[in-house]
Amino acid sequence: MKSGIFDFLLVIPISKSIIYLGDVLLNNIALGVILITILINIIILPIMIKSTVSQQKMQLIQPEMERIQNKYKGRKDQTSQMRMSAEIQALYKKNDISMLASFTTFLTLPIMFAMWQAVQRIEILYQTNMFGINLGAKPIDHVFKFEIAYIVLLTIVALTQYFAMKINTIMSRRNTKYRETSQMQSMNMMNNFMTLFIIYFAAIMPAAMSLYWMTTNIITIVRTWYIYIYHVEKAQKEVDQANTNYLTKRQNKNK
């Protein structure tokens, strides 16, 4: 099979790293998958922090954004549009928001897809047993035989997938200013669909993929909790302080 540049740069190095770490150093290829998954998520953590903080700040400044947009509502002349754009830019600057930060998440997608491909292609992984589970077997074939290990595996995948999808909303609700928009409700519906989608594929694909999904889900939950507690909530305080300073300056100016 001919390898493309994507395989050469990402998939093959990740596959070899899993095999080396798991089979050579740890004598367990499944542990190699878990550790490389953790390592990759540590590498992309700074990108995820920047993106999540920026997205949360964007939500927090929505009332001010709407105030500016309403101020220029119906005014289509170039001067008004330029003033509105300048005020929005000033709002971003005041709250230290980069317009490009929310798009940085997309930079991580090739890496995560490469990890997915790497796990699928490591044949030795499907000959491995872990906790009484044959990682090459399809869980669905064993669930209907009431084999507990496979039932537990799919249950853990389902629960971790559900919370991995919900953790952003759960943590956002810690902020008293949080308001769920219609866009967020649509996103929640999509997340519910994705959860069912992943559970279905976890059931019909080799158990090695369930191991990968379970590890990724747990990391996502822990990572999101960490970002919100140590970065987002700090950013929320900065936005509140910036708004307070802005209002104070306006009041002093009007005196």
Task: Cite the ranges covered by each PLM segment.
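Helix-loop-helix
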Residues: M1-K255
